[in-house]
Regions:
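Exposed boundary/loop context
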Residues: 8-9, 87
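C-terminal motif of bacterial Sec signal peptides marking the signal peptidase cleavage site
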Residues: 12-15
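Bacterial N-terminal signal peptides that target proteins for export
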Residues: 1-6
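Residue-level signal for mature regions of secreted extracellular proteins and peptides
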Residues: 9-10, 125
Length: 141
């Protein structure tokens, strides 16, 4: 009996796990060409959103890879060439806050979605961690 609750909770959690993306979901989507200037675009995006963009440390963890993000209650469907970046910005006192993962989606050399970026903590941070792992760069922080 004492194992019934944990087992029930585990089964309920497993039932919530998303199913793998199917070919039907991604069929016909135009990802566009693989981005060439993604690092410049990311730096430009961050330069107007970070507290101290000149001092921030930006680590490009992966090269762009095709990725599809399903629509859920708190996020729209997005697709494109995704890349994982770790960012360490300074706080208002000038101290580094620590690295956090960010995933950028590109189509036709433009950023179309950001998960985990500045101001997108909570669910966005969870998406970024999961997507970085899927892209081959698990966040260890």
């Amino acid at each position: 009996m004492r194992f019934a609750l944990p087992i029930t909770a585990l089964l309920a959690l497993a039932a919530c796990a998303p199913a793998p993306v199917t070919k039907n979901e991604t069929e016909g989507l135009d990802y566009g060409p693989r981005p060439v200037r993604h690092q410049d675009e990311i730096r430009s995006y961050l330069s107007v959103r970070l507290k101290d963009p000149k001092a921030a440390i930006v680590e490009f963890r992966t090269e762009p890879q095709q990725m599809y993000q399903r629509r859920v209650a708190v996020r729209d469907m997005h697709y494109g060439w995704a890349t994982c970046v770790n960012v360490n910005d300074k706080d208002t006192r000038g101290a580094f806050q620590g690295f956090y993962p960010v995933v950028f989606f590109f189509r036709h050399e433009k950023i179309v979605q950001v998960n985990g970026g500045p101001g997108d903590f909570g669910i966005g941070a969870q998406y970024a961690r999961s997507q970085c792992e899927h892209l081959g760069a698990p966040f260890k922080g």
